[in-house]
Amino acid sequence: MQNKNLQEIEPRTLRLINDSLYLIDSKFRNSKTNQIVFMNILKNDFNVTKILRKMSESGVLGSYWPTFKKSIGQMQFDLFHIYTVDEHTLSVLSNLRFMGTNECNKKYKFIYEVYQNIQGKEVLYLSSLFHGIGKGSNKDHSKVGK
């Protein structure tokens, strides 16, 4: 199902994807098959962060998940955040994925061991996507995201 050698998406393919985003409608989003595919992406041990980043860059993630779309390019004007909400969210996911790497095992053995014992990591990844869900609005995101 996946080609681990695939590195980039050709510009022509990206244009075709962009021209087809209108096909990702509520029927598409509510399809059990498509929901399973999305969860399988999160379960994927190979480059889930890169896949979601490509989905975001191509507009697919925002079309599939309209709430995420609201966070794209959304600045956070406070002392704690230097990235846009969408970039911050994908960075959180990337940091979670780092916890399962050999590099993390060498630097932070305890964190690595705790991470290895987590069952259903896809739920953790999904929660990282949800953590900034309310930041795309002008309201208190800690309340909107509940």
Label each PLM-derived region with a short phrase.
Residues 12-14, 54, 66-70, 105-111, ...:
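Composition- and surface-driven signal marking solvent-exposed, interaction-prone regions
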Residues 1-81:
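Non-catalytic interface/linker regions that flank or bridge core catalytic/transmembrane domains
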Residues 7, 62-63, 99-106, 115-120, ...:
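Secondary-structure transition/capping motifs at alpha-helix termini
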Residues 74-78, 102-117, 130:
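Flexible, glycine/threonine-enriched loop-and-boundary segments that flank and lead into catalytic domains
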Residues 78, 82-87, 97:
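Large, well-folded core regions of big proteins
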Residues 84, 111-146:
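Divalent metal-dependent catalytic cores for phosphoryl transfer on phosphate-bearing substrates
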